[in-house]
Amino acid sequence: MRELTKRQSEIYNYIKQVVQTKGYPPSVREIGEAVGLASSFTVHGHLSRLEEKGYIEGDPTKPRAIEIVSDQTNDNINMEETIHVPVIGKVTAGVPITAVENIEEYFPLPEHLTSTHNSDIFILNVVGDSMIEAGILDGDKVIVRSQTIAENGDIIVAMTEEDEATVKRFYKEKNRYRLQPENSTMEPIYLDNVAVIGKVIGLYREM
């Protein structure tokens, strides 16, 4: 492989370090902060040079899609397989949840955090503390499997009457549905009809 400049070595070593500790690569912003580069354009330039020199491989259509190229100098890196899961920024009635217009970004998840077909998985960023007693905190990412049915007690993502996604525990009662927050200070939501979007199957939290 071709020799790296000092800055390229800093970036390359930082990427390796993050992959070793987290199992997935850092974002361009994180790389810039780590090596003291304010411009994402400059970081992209260094990443392009690293790719040209055969140290990394990238996918320009996906953020964080950086792979360390295995060779004699780094074949001891323990890279966990990752999948790039769509992060849903909004949910629109009548539009498939993973429609392009709903996707804010793609987030790399260690593959062991999912247990189903990757195409059925999406992520929602949790806002608020309505599920704190279930261990779901503000700022967490919930891993969701797309489905339109649920069983009593499931933690689901549902569409509210205001066309917003909400994470609650699902209960079907005699003549209505109850969406129960896991926060003893909050009241349940009662609905005549409920649009189930998916079931929460996992949680990701950055420490």
Swiss-Prot record:
Pfam families: LexA_DNA_bind, Peptidase_S24
InterPro entries linked to this entry: ArsR-like_HTH, LexA, LexA-like, LexA/Signal_pep-like_sf, LexA_DNA-bd_dom, LexA_repressor, Peptidase_S24_LexA, Peptidase_S24_S26A/B/C
DNA-binding region (UniProt annotation): 28-48
Catalytic activity: Hydrolysis of Ala-|-Gly bond in repressor LexA
Keywords annotated in UniProt: Autocatalytic cleavage, DNA damage, DNA repair, DNA replication, DNA-binding, Hydrolase, Repressor, SOS response, Transcription, Transcription regulation
Site (Cleavage): A93, G94
EC number: 3.4.21.88
HAMAP family from the UniProt entry: LexA
The protein's assembly and partners: Homodimer.
Protein name: LexA repressor
Organism: Staphylococcus aureus (strain Newman)
Gene (name only): lexA
